[in-house]
Design a protein with these regions (language model features):
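Donor-binding and catalytic core of enzymes assembling or modifying cell-surface/extracellular glycoconjugates
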Residues: 16-95, 99-102
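Pocket-edge positions in alpha/beta enzyme catalytic cores
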Residues: 9, 58, 119-122
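Nucleotide-sugar donor-binding patch of glycosyltransferase catalytic domains
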Residues: 85-139
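Conserved donor-binding/catalytic core segment of Leloir-type glycosyltransferases
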Residues: 1-9
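Loop/helix-junction capping segments adjacent to catalytic residues or to phosphate/diphosphate-binding pockets
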Residues: 10-11, 43, 124
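Short glycine-centered, acidic/aromatic-flanked micro-motifs in structured strand/loop junctions
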Residues: 3, 36, 119
Length: 139
């Protein structure tokens, strides 16, 4: 999971990652390990996410480590951030969440295995909808 965004672009931040994590845990138990890889300025914020934060000796993963993690993930869910674009371009399965800041079409992020959910307001996008799309990919 990549639940973070630039501090000056909080409009890109979906607030229901912990709800999604609960849905994943309730349905799949320990079948999938839910992790996040915070950037350097996101390490403290990662403590608020109910997922394992992957770090390299207390520091953010470098771009090579991050790309490897994404490429080897079963599924990625991300805000419209750098890791989402990496996921799309390395062929990872996943979803990226877009509010009104831009469209998936404008940034050319959608691929065969990587799709977007576009809504007017990310605050109104419920975890159940994201979870439903996620489970469709995994089944």
């Amino acid at each position: 999971l990549f639940p973070f965004c630039s501090p000056h672009l909080t409009i890109k931040k979906w607030p229901y990652y912990n709800n999604l994590i609960k849905n994943i845990s309730d349905k799949f138990g320990h079948e999938y390990k839910v992790v996040t890889a915070p950037g350097p300025s996101e390490i403290d914020d990662a403590k608020d996410i109910n997922a394992l934060a992957l770090l390299d000796n207390g520091r953010a993963l470098d771009i090579s480590q991050l790309t490897s993690l994404i490429k080897n993930s079963s599924f990625v869910v991300a805000n419209d951030t750098g890791p989402a674009h990496i996921a799309a371009h390395v062929g990872a399965k996943g979803l990226t969440l877009f509010g009104k800041h831009t469209t998936a079409y404008k940034v050319s992020i959608e691929r065969e295995n990587f799709k977007a959910i576009q809504v007017t307001d990310l605050n109104n996008l419920k975890a159940e909808k994201v979870f439903e799309r996620l489970t469709n990919f995994l089944s």
